[in-house]
């Protein structure tokens, strides 16, 4: 049986009752090509002098790695001329990126975290790209930040690429979740993980335990119960994982189950969380829900949150449905 490439898969989906518009198909393929280029740069590492700091900072006040800038440029350059987009937005840029006047404009908005987990680059741990696609509001020809401020339920597609021992693109456009592995010999993403599902039950959790003293009471209660293992109220043992790369954590969870948590904490009560809603929380929540899992901010479904700014932050609890529902219930009981 012949292998199914990303291009073939998308074309076949387009033919099935027209569930995937041609312009959206082309946009997803273009994002995939940009991710291939990022993968090659990440893999070269010190050989291409792409490790270390860039000497600049992003809108979040974070020091940029060289590969943050390189990945951001790859995504901008690959997508600006294709005719599918009205504008783009990135973790690395304060304002939306407008399509240059010499290129045709399309009906979609693309948002991305070009290189999630980039603090891991220099120590050779998996990093990744996260992206979200929305429709541009009808009649808008020069999108502003306001046009991006749509709830996650409005996403028409989302995905991530994990750059690890293999490079994998994981994608949804509202009809399940499918994983594609990069065949470097042929330069194509190939369908290797069709219809991915998150197990409902799990014995693994991912959280940065060093911040425990700053957590709200419901999070401490939930984690302490898991740490108590068989002798505690849960009656079974759990294992903890922490990679400090959201893409790597989510990929593990979608592959074998688990819960990923990045709660708000007391160090800065004005911030709703650490992760960004529009290009981290929303796309990952869309993917996890399409795979049968759940995603909340501790109080409500992440996809239902109406954003108020492009770089808005959010607390994140996502993964196996049973665990996400439990920690969310603990938050509601605390109110």
From Swiss-Prot:
<protein>
    <recommendedName>
        <fullName>Fructose-1,6-bisphosphatase class 1</fullName>
        <ecNumber>3.1.3.11</ecNumber>
    </recommendedName>
</protein>
<feature type="binding site">
    <location>
        <position position="208"/>
    </location>
    <ligand>
        <name>substrate</name>
    </ligand>
</feature>
<feature type="binding site">
    <location>
        <position position="113"/>
    </location>
    <ligand>
        <name>Mg(2+) 2</name>
    </ligand>
</feature>
<dbReference type="InterPro" id="IPR000146">
    <property type="entry name" value="FBPase_class-1"/>
</dbReference>
<dbReference type="GO" id="GO:0006000">
    <property type="term" value="P:fructose metabolic process"/>
</dbReference>
<keyword id="KW-0378">Hydrolase</keyword>
<feature type="binding site">
    <location>
        <position position="115"/>
    </location>
    <ligand>
        <name>Mg(2+) 1</name>
    </ligand>
</feature>
<keyword id="KW-0479">Metal-binding</keyword>
<dbReference type="InterPro" id="IPR044015">
    <property type="entry name" value="FBPase_C_dom"/>
</dbReference>
<feature type="binding site">
    <location>
        <position position="116"/>
    </location>
    <ligand>
        <name>Mg(2+) 2</name>
    </ligand>
</feature>
<feature type="binding site">
    <location>
        <begin position="116"/>
        <end position="119"/>
    </location>
    <ligand>
        <name>substrate</name>
    </ligand>
</feature>
<feature type="binding site">
    <location>
        <position position="91"/>
    </location>
    <ligand>
        <name>Mg(2+) 1</name>
    </ligand>
</feature>
<dbReference type="Pfam" id="PF00316">
    <property type="entry name" value="FBPase"/>
</dbReference>
<dbReference type="InterPro" id="IPR028343">
    <property type="entry name" value="FBPtase"/>
</dbReference>
<dbReference type="GO" id="GO:0000287">
    <property type="term" value="F:magnesium ion binding"/>
</dbReference>
<feature type="binding site">
    <location>
        <position position="280"/>
    </location>
    <ligand>
        <name>Mg(2+) 2</name>
    </ligand>
</feature>
<feature type="binding site">
    <location>
        <position position="274"/>
    </location>
    <ligand>
        <name>substrate</name>
    </ligand>
</feature>
<keyword id="KW-0460">Magnesium</keyword>
<dbReference type="GO" id="GO:0030388">
    <property type="term" value="P:fructose 1,6-bisphosphate metabolic process"/>
</dbReference>
<comment type="pathway">
    <text>Carbohydrate biosynthesis; gluconeogenesis.</text>
</comment>
<dbReference type="Pfam" id="PF18913">
    <property type="entry name" value="FBPase_C"/>
</dbReference>
<dbReference type="GO" id="GO:0005829">
    <property type="term" value="C:cytosol"/>
</dbReference>
<dbReference type="GO" id="GO:0006094">
    <property type="term" value="P:gluconeogenesis"/>
</dbReference>
<dbReference type="InterPro" id="IPR033391">
    <property type="entry name" value="FBPase_N"/>
</dbReference>
<comment type="similarity">
    <text>Belongs to the FBPase class 1 family.</text>
</comment>
<dbReference type="GO" id="GO:0042132">
    <property type="term" value="F:fructose 1,6-bisphosphate 1-phosphatase activity"/>
</dbReference>
<feature type="binding site">
    <location>
        <position position="113"/>
    </location>
    <ligand>
        <name>Mg(2+) 1</name>
    </ligand>
</feature>
<dbReference type="GO" id="GO:0006002">
    <property type="term" value="P:fructose 6-phosphate metabolic process"/>
</dbReference>
<keyword id="KW-0119">Carbohydrate metabolism</keyword>
<keyword id="KW-0963">Cytoplasm</keyword>
<dbReference type="GO" id="GO:0005986">
    <property type="term" value="P:sucrose biosynthetic process"/>
</dbReference>
<comment type="subunit">
    <text>Homotetramer.</text>
</comment>
